[in-house]
Amino acid sequence: TAGNAVGTWSASFGDQIDIVASNNDGMGMAMFNAWSKENKVPTFGYDANSDAVAAIGDGYGGTISQHADVQAYLTLRVLRNALDGVDVNTGISVADEAGNVLKEGEDYVYNADQRSYYALNLAVTADNYKDFLDATVPFASVAKQLDAAKNPEKKVWLNIYNSADNFLGATYQPLLQKYDKLLNLNVEYIAGDGQTESN
């Protein structure tokens, strides 16, 4: 594990380790708790998992928010728009009837060649971490309920590739479950294990 690895590295390199950068907060927190916190070595991760964000107050160096609130919204909004047969940008770059709208270039970018929306990452530091303590709060500018008379309930089947993943299970899916209600979507979530394609 990452916690064991940092112990091995510190035994080999001692005080030559000046900073720890991790590909995700799960590993970052394992290293922080096992070694970095006690040795006051700045440790950084990625995902803005709730435990990592809270640990910034205890010396965790920082993390990167994938803007999961915008990711989850975009996932379900594109589905809602397709099911309703409306312009794909409704509720994204163009306000819907409820007033839901995102700012292109600030909240997300659209890549026309890939026909893809991308939520923009945000740095989470000691200066702003308190704003990110609850990673499952819907993004305010797209948290308005659609009118069920104009946007009747639709059924959706959605696979979560690896439900054991901390980001997907603890942040992304809870956000999807909040947005599905706001967008009048009855979503059946299928939990994958990240390994077996048959499930």
Stretches with model-predicted labels:
Residues 78-154:
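Hinge/cleft segment of the Venus flytrap/periplasmic-binding protein
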Residues 1-54, 76, 176, 199:
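Hydrophobic alpha-helical
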Residues 14-18, 36-42, 58-62, 153-155, ...:
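Loop/turn elements at helix/coil->beta-strand transitions in domains of secreted/extracellular proteins
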Residues 23-32, 56-57, 66-89:
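Extracellular/periplasmic ligand-binding modules, especially the Venus flytrap/periplasmic-binding
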Residues 48-61, 122-124:
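Flexible loop/hinge segments that line or gate small-molecule binding clefts
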Residues 53, 130-135, 165-170:
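Short, solvent-exposed loop/turn elements at domain surfaces
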Residues 1, 58-69, 189-193:
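Short beta-strand elements at the ligand-binding edges of bilobed clamshell
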Residues 1, 25, 154-182, 188-199:
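Extracytoplasmic "Venus flytrap"
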